[in-house]
Amino acid sequence: MLDGRIMGLDVGDKTIGVAVSDLMGLTAQGVKTIKRVGKKKDIEELKAIIKEKQVNKIVSGLPKNMNGTLGPQGEKVIKFCELVKAETGIDVEFWDERLSTVAAERSLLEADVSRQKRKKVIDMLAAVIILQGYLDFKINS
């Protein structure tokens, strides 16, 4: 059992998908999609979730190019996560998020979720996929 939960993030330019683990560190559940309004406000919203959910570790998806290199979006995510760590004192690990949004979109399409609803939950579901991948890796290693 963990002494807190792990938070999963899918950081984009317009939104941040947020998920948290259960206390055992076995499953990831979606929390919300934050509409980005500015780094300070975004981090304040994350801090509120961290406090409420008793988070002691953060895993952020790291967008890489298909050849494994880091592009401009990956660099933005790293910079934002460095700010999150500085503001919260919580370590941030990165997890390869290639195709997580594609997987999220596919599962929503298979569930026949309307386009309007998909738009609202896609980033939160991507955060769940990122965090669940990380948790599964930790359980099996």
Swiss-Prot record:
Molecular function via GO: nuclease activity
Top enzyme category: hydrolase
Localization (cell): Cytoplasm
Entry-linked InterPro entries: RNaseH-like_sf, YqgF, YqgF/RNaseH-like_dom, YqgF/RNaseH-like_dom_sf
Biological process per Gene Ontology, one example term: rRNA 5'-end processing
Keywords: Cytoplasm, Hydrolase, Nuclease, Ribosome biogenesis
GO CC, any one term: cytosol
Pfam short name (any one): RuvX
Enzyme Commission number: 3.1.-.-
Domain of life: Bacteria
Main localisation: cytoplasm
Coiled coil: none
SUPFAM superfamilies: Ribonuclease H-like
Family according to the record: Belongs to the YqgF nuclease family.
Function in brief: Could be a nuclease involved in processing of the 5'-end of pre-16S rRNA.
Protein name from the UniProt record: Putative pre-16S rRNA nuclease
Organism placement in taxonomy: Bacteria, Bacillati, Bacillota, Clostridia, Peptostreptococcales
